[in-house]
């Protein structure tokens, strides 16, 4: 049929062309292909990187962002392109998905960022190709475990103040590093576990002979000493078990746990031996029961992270271990049967039955080869060789899976420990930096006041006290200094050199600046006496600085007559009005604080021009009843006491 169409079609076209000269009207135009007209080349701009593709390529998946009309919201009319402020590296994989229909996961990308990009473009991660899906799931699981560990640690730290006594005890047992007492108990129990295991081993060692009897082990020759050691160990284990049982969140689940069973098995032989009689039959059963004391070694799993990781590995590899056991059982039965019939005709053969051949098959498949049972016939030797080779294959196949799981769990624990250590170190560095920054600023401020005093007195230690710090630290100190001058409050911590004591003020707070400078001046004059001037208050330039927002003006609080409920909701600095002595008042917007001063109005430490900062700090009354307003604060002066200083406090971070 196709050959026939191909044969007559050229003739039909030639006939149509031949009739055109005698046609009365032009030939109709061919119908336009709508799909071809709509298939235009579009440009996708992703964070400056331009991608080009066909529109029909994107419309293959209309349920996604690029395949639907929602992408028109991102169309830029000026550049005639679609702009997306997203990651261009991940978009390359997204665009390849539209082209090929296969979504791949780049191993160098963060799993959380990759999921966010897929969610933005409306692509489900379940359609990732088989070549990358396992890698994606592993990274997803590791990230989920990491986030879970972080959330657990944060929740534990946040819920610490509200823990009950039982919860505190259980937390101390599970994490001994939470307190010193828990850490001491942790090491004491570990020491007695080691003593118990060593005692159980040493008591079987021969310790010489007694006249008229055979050689005695150390456990019988020094029975009192070993009994005392065993009693001390069992008492410690019993107390630990009872405390854990008392502090357990769910006692039923604790009793059913593996570690609880190990604890009971480790201490029960001692108590059973105390109530047993000297009957030989009962004593034989007691000797058999004493074998369970060796299970005390499993108590080390609480003290060893490696043993816990091994337990988690065996638990996670239960299916692989089950497959290994099933394969070995099948191979043992098959080769034991073959070896029995192969050696059946041999004289003095040790393969007397199929169960007796199990021993040879197990030893051969595990490549031990004790040599107590060996085949005599040619067929037996051939099947024995096949049994040995098959054992190597059966055992070696699940081993890499177990090793990979152990490595994965081990590295997860290592990363979790490293994250916790880094978080603890980061918090410690932040605390040290905050303290150091605060102390450095106060030290530089005190040195600045002392330098001004030494400049007037002419003390030769001016050069020593005028040391400069780094540029960043100087800018930080200048920022805090300007904040002090703007708000009219002073940054203060407990300082033994100052006569002002901050017993009623918390550390790292802003208090009245005039009181702070006055005490600094008094302290500086006490430490550096001068005969030139008994008082520094007569010098006008002593208390002036390079900042134009210098002096303070006492005004009544504009919101002091508001109700107490209104005052409670206004806890922050409301407005800062900056006024010059001869300049018009500025606006209260934020930009007014960043205006650059004119050259003619450049602040001068020697001039008397002063900028007044009026501060409105509505604070709720602390000691007045509801509905009463606090009276306006008094003007700060030399006689201002500490309670008046602490009345208006603005807390500012040292960093």
UniProtKB/Swiss-Prot annotation:
Entry's localization field = Cell membrane; Cell membrane, Sarcolemma; Cell projection, Dendrite
* Annotated effect of mutating residue 450 to F: In BRGDA9; uncertain significance; gain of function mutation
A GO molecular-function term, please? metal ion binding
Q: Tell what the record comments on domains.
A: Two N-terminal domains regulate binding to and modulation by KCNIP1.
Question: Which residues does this entry mark as bearing Phosphothreonine?
Answer: 459
Main localisation, per the record? Answer: membrane
Which SUPFAM superfamilies does this one have? POZ domain (SSF54695), Voltage-gated potassium channels (SSF81324)
Q: Under which name does UniProt file this protein?
A: A-type voltage-gated potassium channel KCND3
Membrane topology (Extracellular)? 205-223, 278-283, 344-352
Q: What is the effect of changing residue 373 to I?
A: In SCA19; uncertain significance; causes reduced channel activity
Q: Composition bias, kind Polar residues: at what positions?
A: 525-548, 637-647
- Ranges for region Interaction with KCNIP1 and KCNIP2: 6-21, 470-487
Annotated GO CC locations: dendritic spine; GABA-ergic synapse; Kv4.3-KChIP1 channel complex; neuronal cell body; plasma membrane; postsynaptic membrane; postsynaptic specialization membrane; sarcolemma
UniProt keywords (A-Z) are: Brugada syndrome, Cell membrane, Cell projection, Disease variant, Ion channel, Ion transport, Membrane, Metal-binding, Neurodegeneration, Phosphoprotein, Potassium, Potassium channel, Potassium transport, Spinocerebellar ataxia, Transmembrane, Transmembrane helix, Transport, Voltage-gated channel, Zinc
Region entry Mediates dendritic targeting, spans: 472-487
**Which SMART domains does the record match to this protein?**
BTB (SM00225)
Q: Name its species.
A: Homo sapiens
Residues modified to Phosphoserine: 153, 569, 585
- Which residue ranges traverse the bilayer? 183-204, 224-246, 254-277, 284-306, 319-343, 378-400
**What does the UniProt function comment say about this protein?**
Pore-forming (alpha) subunit of voltage-gated A-type potassium channels that mediates transmembrane potassium transport in excitable membranes, in brain and heart. In cardiomyocytes, may generate the transient outward potassium current I(To). In neurons, may conduct the transient subthreshold somatodendritic A-type potassium current (ISA). Kinetics properties are characterized by fast activation at subthreshold membrane potentials, rapid inactivation, and quick recovery from inactivation. Channel properties are modulated by interactions with regulatory subunits.
Report residue spans for region: Interaction with KCNIP1: 70-78
Q: Where is this region: Disordered?
A: 525-565, 615-655
Gene3D superfamilies listed in its UniProt record: 1.10.287.70, Potassium Channel Kv1.1, Chain A, Voltage-gated potassium channels. Chain C
Question: Any intramembrane ranges?
Answer: 353-366, 367-374
Tell me the tissue specificity: Highly expressed in heart and brain, in particular in cortex, cerebellum, amygdala and caudate nucleus. Detected at lower levels in liver, skeletal muscle, kidney and pancreas.
Q: Provide the residue positions that the database annotates as binding K(+).
A: 367-370
The record names the disease as:
Spinocerebellar ataxia 19: A form of spinocerebellar ataxia, a clinically and genetically heterogeneous group of cerebellar disorders. Patients show progressive incoordination of gait and often poor coordination of hands, speech and eye movements, due to degeneration of the cerebellum with variable involvement of the brainstem and spinal cord. SCA19 is a relatively mild, cerebellar ataxic syndrome with cognitive impairment, pyramidal tract involvement, tremor and peripheral neuropathy, and mild atrophy of the cerebellar hemispheres and vermis. Brugada syndrome 9: A tachyarrhythmia characterized by right bundle branch block and ST segment elevation on an electrocardiogram (ECG). It can cause the ventricles to beat so fast that the blood is prevented from circulating efficiently in the body. When this situation occurs, the individual will faint and may die in a few minutes if the heart is not reset.
